[in-house]
UniProtKB/Swiss-Prot annotation:
<protein>
    <recommendedName>
        <fullName>tRNA modification GTPase MnmE</fullName>
        <ecNumber>3.6.-.-</ecNumber>
    </recommendedName>
</protein>
<feature type="binding site">
    <location>
        <position position="21"/>
    </location>
    <ligand>
        <name>(6S)-5-formyl-5,6,7,8-tetrahydrofolate</name>
    </ligand>
</feature>
<feature type="binding site">
    <location>
        <position position="118"/>
    </location>
    <ligand>
        <name>(6S)-5-formyl-5,6,7,8-tetrahydrofolate</name>
    </ligand>
</feature>
<feature type="domain" description="TrmE-type G">
    <location>
        <begin position="215"/>
        <end position="365"/>
    </location>
</feature>
<feature type="binding site">
    <location>
        <begin position="225"/>
        <end position="230"/>
    </location>
    <ligand>
        <name>GTP</name>
    </ligand>
</feature>
<dbReference type="InterPro" id="IPR027266">
    <property type="entry name" value="TrmE/GcvT_dom1"/>
</dbReference>
<keyword id="KW-0378">Hydrolase</keyword>
<feature type="binding site">
    <location>
        <position position="79"/>
    </location>
    <ligand>
        <name>(6S)-5-formyl-5,6,7,8-tetrahydrofolate</name>
    </ligand>
</feature>
<feature type="binding site">
    <location>
        <position position="444"/>
    </location>
    <ligand>
        <name>(6S)-5-formyl-5,6,7,8-tetrahydrofolate</name>
    </ligand>
</feature>
<feature type="binding site">
    <location>
        <position position="225"/>
    </location>
    <ligand>
        <name>K(+)</name>
    </ligand>
</feature>
<dbReference type="GO" id="GO:0005829">
    <property type="term" value="C:cytosol"/>
</dbReference>
<keyword id="KW-0479">Metal-binding</keyword>
<dbReference type="Pfam" id="PF12631">
    <property type="entry name" value="MnmE_helical"/>
</dbReference>
<dbReference type="Pfam" id="PF01926">
    <property type="entry name" value="MMR_HSR1"/>
</dbReference>
<dbReference type="GO" id="GO:0003924">
    <property type="term" value="F:GTPase activity"/>
</dbReference>
<keyword id="KW-0342">GTP-binding</keyword>
<keyword id="KW-0547">Nucleotide-binding</keyword>
Length: 444
C-alpha cells in the first residue's frame, strides 16, 4: 500500500455535489499540485480552494483533510467536494490521476481500512451490505453488524482447531515424552464433530434468515387464467404482467419486488400449470416447477367460484411440504366453493388483497429476526469461507473414522485454521482478501 489511490465516491451523475476521495502517502502532495497551494496536515480540517488545470480555474471546492491514522483508511486521506457535474468531476479526477494517483479498485478504500486495522472483516462486509440494503430491516441488521463486530464465535472455533493442531504436533515431535498428553482418535473425532455441528448450525441459521437481507421469494402458482397476473399487479400496484383471458399468456417468470413494512418481497408470477403441447409454454411450466423448489413462500391461487379439479389437487400435493398459503380468488362472487380448504379469500379483480398482505406478514416468523441479530455469519463472502472450512473438516473427520493416522490429518486442520483466520481478519492470504473486496463499490 505504498501508492495513492483515488475514485469518485458519489454516483457519477449530474448533481449538486460530487465527492472525490484520495488516500495514500502522496495525498497531500497531489492535492497541493492541483490547487497550486500547499495543503498542510495542520490547521483547519476543511479549506476552500480553487482547482487548476494548467493556469485555468476549473472549479472552487471544499477540501476535507484527514491525517493518518485518524481516517477511514488509516492513511492520509482527502475528500474533495466539488460541484456535481459529470464533466467537471471527471476533469478533477483526471488531474488527480495525472498528478500521481491511480484509480482505486472496487472496495479498495475499505480494504485498506481493513488491512490497517480500522475495520474488522465483519464490519467491512456489513458496510457493503448497508450500502446495498433495500429495506429498513436489512439496514438495521447491517448496522448491527458494524456496531457489534466481535468475533466470539469464530474465536472459539479458531482456538479449538489450534488446540487440536498443537496437541497432535507435540505428539509427533516429542513421542518419547510420556508426560505429554496423547490425542486419541476418539478425542479427535469428538472435537472435530463438535466444530462441524457448530458450523452446520450457523450455516443453517444464515440460510434461514437470508431473506431478511435479500428478500423473500414469493412464488404465485396455479392453473392458467385463475388470476395470477391480476393478483401480482394488485400486490405491486403496477400493470407488470399481461392480463388476458387467453390461457398460457404468462409463459415466462415475471418478477417484481415490493417493500412490505421494511421487508423485501420478490414476487414471481409463473406460467399456469397444465398439460400443454405448446413447446414455449412448456418451458415456462418447467421454470415454474423450478421456482417452487426455490420458493420461500408459495401463494397457491385458486378460482373459488368452482371446486378445485384434479390438476389443482396435484399442485396442492406438490407444495404440501413447502411454506404456502392457499389464496381463494374471486371472493366478490360470494360462492366459496372450496370452504373445506383453509385459505385467504381475496378479489384480485377488485384489488381487494389486504387480507392476503396481512397473512403474509403473519407468516413471517418473529424468531427469524432474533436469529438474524445474533448471526455469526453476516455476508455471502463469510458463508463461502465457512462452507470451505466445513468441507475440509468433514473430509478430515471421515478419514479419521476410516483409520487414517492423526499426523496425516493435521494439514487439513491447518487449512481450516487459516480460513477461520481469514474471516477474523488475521490471515495474510491477500488473494482471498482481494476477492472479497472486489464485490464492493468503487470509491468505497
Amino acid at each position: 500500500m505504498n501508492d495513492t489511490i483515488t475514485a469518485i465516491a458519489t454516483p457519477n451523475i449530474n448533481s449538486a455535489i460530487s465527492i472525490i476521495r484520495i488516500s495514500g502517502p502522496n495525498t497531500y502532495e497531489i492535492v497541493s499540485k492541483i490547487t497550486k497551494k500547499e495543503i498542510t496536515k495542520t490547521g483547519y480540517t476543511f479549506v476552500k480552494e480553487f482547482i487548476y488545470q494548467n493556469d485555468l480555474i476549473i472549479d472552487e471546492v471544499i477540501i476535507l483533510k484527514y491525517v493518518a491514522p485518524k481516517s477511514f483508511t488509516g492513511e492520509d486521506l482527502i475528500e474533495i467536494n466539488c460541484h456535481g457535474g459529470v464533466l467537471i468531476t471527471n476533469k478533477i479526477l483526471d488531474l488527480i490521476l495525472e498528478s500521481g494517483a491511480r484509480l482505486a479498485e472496487n472496495g479498495e478504500f475499505t480494504k485498506r481500512a481493513f488491512l490497517n486495522n480500522k475495520l474488522t472483516l465483519r464490519q467491512a462486509n456489513s458496510i457493503n451490505n448497508l450500502i446495498f440494503s433495500k429495506t429498513d430491516i436489512a439496514t438495521n441488521l447491517s448496522s448491527n453488524g458494524i456496531i457489534n463486530s466481535n468475533n466470539d464465535f469464530f474465536l472459539d472455533i479458531k482456538e479449538k482447531i489450534f488446540y487440536l493442531i498443537g496437541k497432535i504436533e507435540v505428539n509427533i515431535d516429542y513421542p518419547e515424552y510420556e508426560d505429554v498428553e496423547q490425542v486419541t482418535a476418539k478425542e479427535f473425532n469428538l472435537e472435530v464433530k463438535e466444530i462441524i455441528d457448530k458450523l452446520n448450525k450457523t450455516i443453517n441459521d444464515f440460510n434461514k434468515v437470508s431473506y431478511l437481507y435479500n428478500g423473500l421469494n414469493v412464488v404465485i402458482v396455479g392453473k392458467p387464467n385463475v388470476g395470477k397476473s391480476s393478483l401480482l399487479n394488485s400486490l405491486i400496484k403496477k400493470n407488470k404482467a399481461i392480463v388476458s383471458d387467453i390461457k398460457g399468456t404468462t409463459r415466462d417468470l415475471v418478477t417484481e419486488s415490493i417493500n412490505l413494512e421494511g421487508l423485501l418481497l420478490n414476487f414471481i408470477d409463473t406460467a399456469g400449470i397444465r398439460e400443454s403441447k405448446n413447446k414455449i409454454e412448456n418451458i415456462g411450466i418447467k421454470k415454474t416447477m423450478a421456482s417452487i423448489k426455490e420458493a420461500d413462500l408459495i401463494l397457491f391461487l385458486i378460482d373459488d367460484s368452482k371446486k378445485i379439479d384434479k390438476k389443482e389437487k396435484e399442485i396442492l400435493n406438490l407444495i404440501k411440504n413447502k411454506n404456502y398459503i392457499i389464496v381463494k380468488n374471486k371472493s366478490d362472487l360470494k360462492v366459496n366453493a372450496n370452504s373445506e380448504l383453509k385459505g385467504i379469500s381475496i378479489s384480485a379483480l377488485k384489488k381487494d388483497v389486504k387480507p392476503l398482505v396481512n397473512e403474509i406478514k403473519t407468516n413471517l416468523k418473529q424468531g427469524d429476526f432474533n436469529i438474524a441479530n445474533n448471526l455469526a455469519i453476516c455476508s455471502d463472502n463469510e458463508l463461502k469461507i465457512i462452507k470451505q472450512v466445513l468441507l475440509v473438516l468433514k473430509k478430515s473427520y471421515a478419514n479419521s473414522l476410516s483409520g487414517f493416522p492423526l499426523d496425516l490429518l493435521v494439514e487439513d486442520l491447518k487449512v481450516a485454521y487459516e480460513k477461520i483466520c481469514t474471516i477474523m481478519g488475521l490471515s495474510e492470504d491477500l488473494n482471498i482478501i482481494d476477492k472479497m473486496f472486489k464485490n464492493f463499490c468503487l470509491g468505497k
